[in-house]
Amino acid sequence: MKITTLVDNNRLDSRPDLAVERGLSLHIKTESLSMLFDMGGGGTFCQNAPLLDVEIKDVDLAVISHRHHDHCNGAIDFVRHNSNANVFLKHSDERSYYFRAYGFKNNVGINPDLLKNSSGRLKFVNKTTEIARNVFIITDICDKYEKPKGNQYLYTKSQH
């Protein structure tokens, strides 16, 4: 298995040719499968992919870890550059996610255009699901561990 970071928050001194954006996108390649885990906040991962020998058009499936813009809004670009792969994410009735601190409020949720214009390729799951042979999405993450302190500033529209 090979995991390639297509985009994240940090610039590599050894790779000034790679663009940086807030967010994350990983390409995971196995002997039989090409997958994306998250797609960053925009199309930057698509710009970086050819520089890292990754063909977005050949990706078999994609997974969105959660509905914050810096992990999922690049999916709009993904469906433009890849005509076949499904994009999997956890079902949620919540549509709007916000960050609020020090008098500022910012929408940090999924772009509603993605939910409307995904050509039927957005697949919602609500339980542990095998999405490819031996590849599972786990939707129920336990609360056994303390959440990051920054989460105190995150909420959904229905919470406030």
Give the positions of each predicted feature.
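Active-site-proximal loop/helix segment associated with metal-binding centers of metalloenzymes
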Residues: F99-K105, G109, L115, K127-H160
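Short acidic low-complexity segments
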Residues: E55-D58, L122-I131
